[in-house]
Amino acid sequence: WGSKSSSNWNQAVSVMTSKNGGSFYGNDVKKGGCFYVEYDGNKDDLELILQSWSGGASWAKVSISESGSANGHRYIKCSYDNCVSAFGTSDFSGKLDQVHVSAKSGNITVYSVCYIY
């Protein structure tokens, strides 16, 4: 994707799920994996948000399970369990409609968003 930037309380990245014509597959979100976001900005000054208009939590902010540095950038990981806890269900293929990465109080540049195992 290259990189995407945003300032406080705006989305740097918004990806629709495949059931809505987008490129992210909700059925990829499985136990044992996590969302991985690589970015520049203040430490942990971003949010992973799972959005649903199909019966899941409408705007679920997922807690960060790990953060650090890699490839000259910062990263966060949000575990499967944290995703289920925030979203209220494990039915990501049926109820997840969009994934967002949002800046909190500062500016961020996002380089990568993926679900890893």
Show which residues each predicted segment covers.
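Extracellular ligand-binding interfaces
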Residues: 1-95, 103-117
